[in-house]
Amino acid sequence: MKLVDYLLEGSVKHFTLIDPDKSVDYLKIVRYALDAGTDGILVGGSLGIRETQMTQVVKDIKSVAHVPVVLFPGSPSQLTEEADGVLFLSVLNSLDPYFIIGAQVQGAVLIAKHFPRLEVISTAYVIVGDGGAAGFVSMSKPIPYARWDLAVAYALAAYYIGFGAVYLEAGSGAPQPVPPEMVRAVRKVFPRVLIVGGGIRSGEAARQLARERPNVIVTGTLAEEQPEKLAEVVRAIKSSL
């Protein structure tokens, strides 16, 4: 099954984000996530990981994981064909063209020449609220939590341009997640893959988001700091259906 079909199929899925630059013992976190019932692993997010390191990290994870392992690259240097796919990110609300199209031009050439078997999902990355490190590094102008209408406008633009996915990102360690009302509004206008992440620290927060029917809910900081709570989050997502 193609990765995009897996993401679209069935109920809301939970993915665990592994940042190998932050997580020395990333396999321990992966095992916690697998035991909790996670549906997939995202790998990336850092600026300090090279291709050779990423290749080894993905190999290590795939040696223990029975779920898809997908790249979430912080730069074009974080590509490897060992993964099952890549979220080919364009930060739509960045103020720097590099993060909208510059890095993507570099990454596209690398994929075409060196990683042609890697499944690519074009992803409109939209920074919301606090934005966290992702918003700072990408020089974004985050969408305020209360302005769901702006999120809808970006989602519509992503749809008409032809993106295969929209990722609403509140940022690593954000004080609160993307509001459920914003997810609901975007879901109504974007029928493709919808991903939500950032600031999700409890089962109840995950349950409220899952009720709005995104395709994927991502937790990263929680996995790093309190991996024992992953089971609570996954149960909440599954029980919301």
Curated annotation (Swiss-Prot):
Gene3D superfamilies: FMN-linked oxidoreductases. GO terms for cellular component: cytoplasm. Transmembrane segments: none annotated. Its EC number is 2.5.1.41. Mg(2+) binds at D19, S46. Keywords: Cytoplasm, Lipid biosynthesis, Lipid metabolism, Magnesium, Metal-binding, Phospholipid biosynthesis, Phospholipid metabolism, Transferase. One of its GO terms (biological process) is glycerophospholipid biosynthetic process. Sn-glycerol 1-phosphate binds at Y167, L168, E169, A170, G171, S172, G173, G198, G199, G220, T221. Its main location: cytoplasm. It holds the Pfam family PcrB. It is found in: Cytoplasm. Pathway: Membrane lipid metabolism; glycerophospholipid metabolism. Its cofactor is Mg(2+). InterPro entries: GGGP/HepGP_synthase_I, GGGP/HepGP_synthase_sf, GGGP_HepGP_synthase, GGGP_synth. It is an enzyme of class 2 (transferase). GO terms for molecular function: magnesium ion binding; phosphoglycerol geranylgeranyltransferase activity. It catalyses: sn-glycerol 1-phosphate + (2E,6E,10E)-geranylgeranyl diphosphate = sn-3-O-(geranylgeranyl)glycerol 1-phosphate + diphosphate. Prenyltransferase that catalyzes the transfer of the geranylgeranyl moiety of geranylgeranyl diphosphate (GGPP) to the C3 hydroxyl of sn-glycerol-1-phosphate (G1P). This reaction is the first ether-bond-formation step in the biosynthesis of archaeal membrane lipids. Belongs to the GGGP/HepGP synthase family. Group II subfamily. This is Geranylgeranylglyceryl phosphate synthase. It comes from Pyrobaculum calidifontis (strain DSM 21063 / JCM 11548 / VA1).
